[in-house]
Regions:
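Conserved small/polar residues in nucleotide/adenosyl-binding loops
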Residues: 190-191
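Catalytic Tyr-X3-Lys loop
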Residues: 97, 104-123, 142, 166
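Catalytic loop of short-chain dehydrogenase/reductase
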Residues: 18-20, 140-165, 171, 175-178
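Canonical Rossmann dinucleotide-binding motif of NAD(H)/NADP(H)-dependent dehydrogenases/reductases
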Residues: 11-41
C-alpha cells in the first residue's frame, strides 16, 4: 500500500482551469490528460461542472481532483497550484466570458469583468504555474485564445480587448520563460 501511495503522489499532474460543459474544451482536455496517465486537477467556479467531470474521469480509470476556483481570486488560484505541488507538468487556462454587448451600452463593471476573467485570471494562473515549473526547468503552459485575440468584432469589444491582452501576456511569458525550459503557448480556438 505504501508503494501505491508513493506512486500516486508522484504522478505527473495537469491543472485545467475553465472546465465547463462535458463536451467543452476544458472537460475534454481533462479526460485526455487523465487517459495519458496524469492526475488532473480540474478547476471551475461552477461546482456542478466539477461534480459531473471528476466521477467520469475516475470511472475511466483516471485520477482527478476537483478544486473550485474563481480565476479572478488570487488566493484561490494560489491554492489551486499548491494542490498541484511539484509534479506539475501541464497547465491550461481556459477561462473566459464571451458575452456580446455594444460598447456604448457597457458599464465599467461589464468591461472590467471581461478583462478580469480573460486577462487578469490568465496572469494569476500563468504566474503560479511558472513558479512551480521553474525549479525543474520544464513544463507546458497553454492559454486558450479565440479569433477575438487577433481582431476586433462588433458587439464583442470587451471580450476582444481581454483576449488580445491574454495573447500578448502569453507572448511575453513565452519570451521570458522559454529560454528556461518552460513552453508557453496561446492556442487559438475558432468555432
Amino acid at each position: 500500500i505504501h508503494h501505491q501511495q508513493k506512486q500516486k503522489s508522484s504522478m505527473k499532474k495537469a491543472v485545467i482551469l475553465g472546465v465547463g460543459p462535458e463536451a467543452g474544451l476544458g472537460s475534454q482536455l481533462a479526460l485526455r490528460f487523465a487517459r495519458e496517465g496524469m492526475h488532473v486537477l480540474v478547476a471551475s467556479r461552477t461546482p456542478s461542472a466539477l461534480e459531473k467531470l471528476v466521477p467520469k474521469i475516475r470511472e475511466s480509470g483516471g485520477e482527478a481532483t476537483a478544486v473550485p476556483t474563481d480565476a479572478t481570486n488570487e488566493e484561490q488560484v494560489v491554492s489551486l497550484f499548491e494542490n498541484a505541488g511539484a509534479d506539475l507538468e501541464v497547465a491550461v487556462y481556459n477561462a473566459g466570458n464571451n458575452h456580446p454587448g455594444r460598447i456604448v451600452e457597457m458599464d465599467t463593471e461589464y468591461f472590467e469583468n471581461s478583462w478580469r476573467v480573460c486577462c487578469l485570471g490568465g496572469f494569476l494562473f500563468g504566474r503560479e504555474a511558472v513558479k512551480r515549473m521553474l525549479p525543474k526547468k520544464k513544463g507546458t503552459l497553454i492559454f486558450t485564445g479565440a479569433s477575438a485575440s487577433l481582431r476586433g468584432r462588433a458587439n464583442f469589444g470587451a471580450f476582444n480587448s481581454a483576449k488580445s491582452g491574454l495573447r500578448t501576456l502569453a507572448q511575453a511569458m513565452s519570451k521570458e520563460y522559454g529560454p528556461e525550459g518552460i513552453h508557453v503557448a496561446l492556442s487559438l480556438i475558432h468555432i
